[in-house]
């Protein structure tokens, strides 16, 4: 009752607006499948199960999902043009948008510690990161993978200038690599499908490395929409938290990968991406010390690399009240283990979601 009362008080504290006719959610990937969906985030589960549509059934508000081949930068353009209300987006593009004046709020994490890989054609002589010097390498610039790639290069004594970098989206990079149009590519789980077909080799993986090399993603809302429709924002967050709970349960591991496979990325690829990693650690919605520290590090790195022209703050960009209300309402306070800025578990935050496999 207390949680419901606080949610009601939250809604009452802001000016009343008519319910929106539509809630538009932009997803920073082209996705795949029919209907189009995506994987690697609890949001994909909510999409596949139609939990958001269910939450707004009978309210007069419909839900629209929009997928962007141009990933994070294209989502920023849609936010700027008020074509979407919520965005599932990676850390770098969301902060580039903020630095460029987009008024958004970060509501929750939704797919963290996403791995980065370097792949080469199966017959390539490239064996290590250092071998990329002077080679044609695909990097999807402006995405969260871009900054992670720069950090991996730096850890191996290279800069982006040491490569013949080519800016290609995910699909174009795959076509270029298998036709030897590029010598190597940075990317994510989408490469496992080609690896399993014997077309490419993985020469580097962030798995088991410093989690600072991984990529984070979250759910944002346009500030204007959040201020006008706090009740609807709460409903959306409730659904994403419900999806995070389901996606964090090890009993659902096989079903989760089957759900994500609807996007066209096979189950085997998800098994490889999540190998030796707990679901709860990857699918927690918490904006904990680790997630906040990574977003702050992204600001510093992006500024140094001149990917943004001015620094931006992170602490006041986060709007935690909806997540906190959801955790109370759904009885999930203490469900996920929090991690510190280095990605280590915070003592005393053992949780039911961290059960070992």
What are the functions of these language-model segments?
Residues 300-357:
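Conserved C-terminal helix/tail region of periplasmic/extracytoplasmic solute-binding proteins
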Residues 22-48, 142:
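Extracytoplasmic "Venus flytrap"
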Residues 33, 228-312:
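Secondary-structure end/capping motifs
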Residues 65-77, 90, 158-178:
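Short helix-initiation/N-cap motifs at beta->coil->alpha
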